[in-house]
């Protein structure tokens, strides 16, 4: 399995090689096509160019055991991915999120990279702890790097009032709020 490319980017593609007994190949292909239709329908508005395909490999891939495959899938399903919490103070602002940005299974080694962002430090730590616990319970070694402090926006700051007024004078309309969050990276092996 090879999905995503960078820990600070939403994955855009993934490939996976699986071993299937010849007697089950027709059923696996049919189920793949069924799931592909479901996924494409679910994401048609936000990812209209999603492409999912199945093809036969030129050679037999090196495989991991079924039990390890199930452990990996179950653990990935437990790891927060996407919006974790919206801001209770600023409408429409994502307060915290996590991106499972990279998953790689190669040479019998499982590696993931994820990135947590939050304007609230304790919430970022909560997401990081949840991810750590999920992967450590599977027996993985978890390394946390690239921690940046959370920064909670102050919608009532003096500079914001001045900048809003200046924007209104220049453009004769109200500005739209924009905020950035800070990051914590995870690598799991």
Language-model features, listed with the residues they occupy:
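Midchain, well-structured core segments that form catalytic/ion-binding scaffolds
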Residues: 1-117
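Charged/polar, solvent-exposed surface patches and flexible loops
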Residues: 27-30, 34-41, 74, 78, ...
């Amino acid at each position: 399995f090879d999905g995503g490319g960078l820990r600070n980017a939403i994955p855009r593609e993934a490939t996976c090689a699986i071993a299937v007994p010849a007697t089950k190949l027709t059923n696996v292909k049919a189920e793949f096509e069924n799931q592909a239709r479901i996924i494409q329908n679910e994401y048609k508005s936000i990812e209209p160019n999603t492409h999912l395909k199945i093809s036969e490999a030129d050679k037999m891939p090196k495989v991991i055991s079924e039990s390890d495959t199930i452990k990996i899938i179950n653990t990935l399903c437990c790891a927060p991915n996407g919006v974790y919490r919206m801001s209770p103070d600023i409408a429409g602002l994502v307060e915290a999120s996590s991106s499972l940005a990279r998953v790689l299974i190669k040479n019998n080694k499982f590696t993931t990279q994820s990135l947590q962002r939050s304007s609230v430090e304790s919430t970022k730590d909560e997401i990081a702890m949840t991810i750590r616990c999920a992967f450590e319970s599977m027996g993985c070694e978890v390394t946390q790097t690239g921690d940046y402090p959370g920064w909670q926006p102050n919608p009532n700051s003096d500079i914001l009032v001045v900048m809003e007024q200046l924007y209104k004078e220049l453009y004769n309309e109200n500005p739209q709020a924009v905020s950035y969050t800070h990051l914590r990276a995870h690598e799991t092996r």
